[in-house]
Amino acid sequence: SDVCSSDLFKKFCAGETDISNGSRPIKESEIELCKKGGIEYIELPIAFDGLSVVVNKDNNFASCLKTAELKKIWEPAAQGKINNWNQVRPGFPNQKLGLYGPGTDSGTYDYFMENIVGKKVGSRGDYTASEDDNLIVQGVSTDKGGLGFFGYAYYEENKDKLKLLQIDGGSGCVAPSTATIADGTYKPLSRPEFIYVKKEAATRPEVKAFVDYQLAAANSKLISEVGYVPMPEDIMMLVRKRFSDGTVGTVFANAPKGSKVKDLLEK
């Protein structure tokens, strides 16, 4: 879970761990922490995940939301002002909007807000925040006007209780699926999942064996089983090369919105 990508990076940059998982790329502040700690790292995307935006099962008016509408709902200026569905789009009913999502410490929150509201902006504070996705499911499924978001895998587990929305990121309405997440057409809410490996630990046999296992083609079945979307083999070849070459630093931290993983790895 990404309950705290931030905490994991803090430990990693302090030299307490050899490998850190991240449900988002390393942040500028963490790059500085690692620099201070003298930690060089290899950045490896290992799978894709998409964020699902869901509404109550009985919602019969919303099927696709534009990213601009999501922004209107979640931006800080919406606090106490955008309270009903008809304020999101004329034609939607005058029904109370109930918002549910992960807390501000989570990688999922960061990723959603950066791509929907904007970098370093944050969100309105008057929503029901929980680090437990199950509580978000419960909230949306019992609130007729509910809307929430979390990882795609979690929607798959709970799809009988919720309605999945399509998202229009500028090229028409697209629903998240293993296909649209892997090929990047579900944007801007599909993302890579990472591991960061401490450079000086990368040659240790047990660390190398663990990373090789994570990057092996045979691992894609396991990735699917835990609810993520495997990366296409042409991308995984570039990731394996990055590890075997010991290429340090980040290409994802300041990548422009909507960048393709393959393009970044080929830089």
Feature roles, as predicted:
Residues 1-267:
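Flexible loop/hinge segments at secondary-structure junctions
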